[in-house]
């Protein structure tokens, strides 16, 4: 990977995607955001990101279908799922079995934990706790 790492964030909550964009941009990432599954797929095709952040509940295509398509078309690209849907771990287990790199519940308790997971996905060391 050369230059700035690139992320695509796909979530139907504009405020959430803008917060993700701002957080990662200030840390040297290039971030592209999409509010629907189909537009997210187009961004992945156009930008070939280093990692994808995706919600499960999306207009046009749910996160499960999106994850499965990404695994077929971009098997080396880590996909991190961030969702408000929490069922005691069943969803997490299913997503990991489908090939997700990691799973986070909304609301996120720490953007730093997400950043550390993205760095792990990209093969970089995580930030040191202060």
PLM regions: where:
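Residue-level signal for the "D+5" position in two-component response regulator receiver
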Residues: 33, 58-61
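Acidic catalytic/metal-coordinating carboxylates
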Residues: 36-39, 62-65
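Short hydrophobic/Thr-rich beta-strand motif most characteristic of the beta2 strand and flanking loop
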Residues: 28-35, 43
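Conserved acidic segment of CheY-like receiver
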Residues: 4-15, 20-24
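Active-site beta3 strand of CheY-like receiver
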Residues: 47-53, 58
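The feature encodes the CheY-like receiver
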Residues: 17, 59, 87
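Hydrophobic/aromatic residues positioned on beta-strands within the core alpha/beta folds
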Residues: 82-83
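Alpha4 helix (beta4-alpha4-beta5 surface) of REC/receiver domains from two-component response regulators
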Residues: 65, 86-116
């Amino acid at each position: 990977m050369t230059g700035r790492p690139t992320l695509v964030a796909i979530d139907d909550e504009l405020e959430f995607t803008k917060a993700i964009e701002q957080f990662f941009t200030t840390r040297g990432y290039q971030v592209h955001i999409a509010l629907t599954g189909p537009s997210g797929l187009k961004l992945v095709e156009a930008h070939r990101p280093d990692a994808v952040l995706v919600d499960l509940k999306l207009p046009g295509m749910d996160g499960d279908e999106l994850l499965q398509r990404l695994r077929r078309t971009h098997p080396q690209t880590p996909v991190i799922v961030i969702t408000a849907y929490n069922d005691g771990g069943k969803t997490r287990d299913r997503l990991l079995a489908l090939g997700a790199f990691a799973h986070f519940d909304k609301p996120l308790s720490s953007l730093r934990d997400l950043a550390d997971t993205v760095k792990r996905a990209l093969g970089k060391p995580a930030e040191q706790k202060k």
